[in-house]
Amino acid sequence: MAEYYLISQLPSLDGINESTPLPITSERFTELCERFLGKKAQGEFQRITLAPPRNSEKVSSDLIEKWNDGERNLRLALAKLRAEKLGKSFESDSQSFSTGLLQAARTAVEIESPMEAEKFLNKYRLDFLETLRPMDSFSEEFVFYYGLKLKLIERIRKFDPESGEAAYRNIYDSIMNGDRSEVTQ
């Protein structure tokens, strides 16, 4: 019942673009979740991440489980394709990927600009998340969906093209030269 009060206070994230101010911050959203969600749902809420661990951890939320699987597979497909492009080996535990996911990963790997590749991947992630959107807009699963969508929108807004390009070049040069100096910087 409490999620009704929570969700009714949330502004819509639909139609938000890069120039539109966000109607809510992660901090405010977290405050509302801590206030209205039960302990079990709060535990699941704390496990929402844009970077799930490589080895899957069982969660009770179907939405979070599907998100984690999709994001993990996307990251593994990207790593595999990037490694192939550089002539390196990559251990992916004989992972098989869907055709759509592989096509998205191939497209992202072929985009020259890292910033444009990230924008493409962010759109792919938002589209994937939309396929997971719960039918019941007043459920705990919808709260988790909303949290993931807010995190994705905030993530792309944090990108700074100039510093990102410099960091990318540093890491790329380090990898191509076979050293690990990017880790210490």
Predicted region positions:
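Extended alpha-helical surfaces
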Residues: 1-185
